[in-house]
Amino acid sequence: EGTEEEEERYNNRAPIYAEFAKIVCISVVARNKDDSIKKISFCGDDEKQILSDFFQLLNSAPMANLGGHNVKAFDIPFLCKRAIINSLKIPKVLDYGTYPAWKMDLVRDTMELRKRSAFLSTSLELIASCLDLPSPKSIMNGAEVSSIYWESLNNAEWHQQKLMEIKDYCE
């Protein structure tokens, strides 16, 4: 049996390890044929269904590029590990192993772009602020998502409200 300090450390760190986590929301932004932008979110309690629906979108959409903040180092490996744990086939666009090195430019990562500056890392919040873009990251931060989700499970109505807050954060 662990100490209270060990338990707190586990609760704070485990959600960022795919082996111990659970995906409850995936949000993406897609460009329509008329160049308008739309948000698409997959959110709920069934992680395998969320991943399946997201992968179906990736497999069916003629995407030239994927993009995100720290997406190459965190999001894509995390999604792939959770896919394996859920016995799902990883979509080709996420499977780095299927691409030759010269085709990795299909994934744009703002963290990599910022690493070319004097600072080694830059938060998504700072990038959004510099570009004068709104950021929902003020609602909560990534470290809070796990506890908000798990603590809301005891009350169905509150749980749905918290899932929508997590969705807003992800978008």
Each language-model region and where it sits:
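Catalytic micro-motifs at enzyme active sites that drive phosphoryl/nucleotidyl and oxygen chemistry
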Residues: R13-Y17, F54-F55, G67-H69, D95
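Generic alpha-helical structural signal
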Residues: S52-F55, M164, E171
